[in-house]
Amino acid sequence: MPATNILANLFVTLYNNETRRKGECTILPTSKLGIEVLKTLQKDGYIGEFEHIDDKRGGKFKIKLLAKITKCGAISPRFKVKTDEFNNWEQQYLPAYDRGMLLVTTNQGVMSHHEATQKGIGGFLIGYVY
């Protein structure tokens, strides 16, 4: 049965494997947005190395977990957020001011809300991690 929301599937699989203390996990199917989200999570130190395996059936990710994710999830529907509105959404989804990050898709790619605030750009919220 095909996944209806590939991004939500990615976050749920990461969360389930982290809570079970697994060292690595496999996520399928893949997407370009999923690759960008994983690059952002890797850059901020939430996951280790990951590789994309093309098996001609949608592909899959093999991800090394670092046991740094307490909670993560997709935000649906994708709310449009201006630069000065990140604090309101941060209070809604994150447990503390300086803990975790919101994932934002912008015209410059997927990035954390901290990076988007520094660059002075807004975008659509796609997920949260802490």
Curated annotation (Swiss-Prot):
One annotated GO biological process: translation
GO cellular component: cytosolic small ribosomal subunit
Domain of life (superkingdom): Archaea
Protein keywords: Ribonucleoprotein, Ribosomal protein, RNA-binding, rRNA-binding
GO molecular-function term, one example from the UniProt record: rRNA binding
InterPro entries per record: Ribosomal_uS8, Ribosomal_uS8_sf
Subunit structure: Part of the 30S ribosomal subunit.
Function text: One of the primary rRNA binding proteins, it binds directly to 16S rRNA central domain where it helps coordinate assembly of the platform of the 30S subunit.
UniProt similarity note: Belongs to the universal ribosomal protein uS8 family.
NCBIfam families (alphabetical): PRK04034.1 (NF003115)
UniProt-recorded name of the protein: Small ribosomal subunit protein uS8
Originating organism: Nitrosopumilus maritimus (strain SCM1)
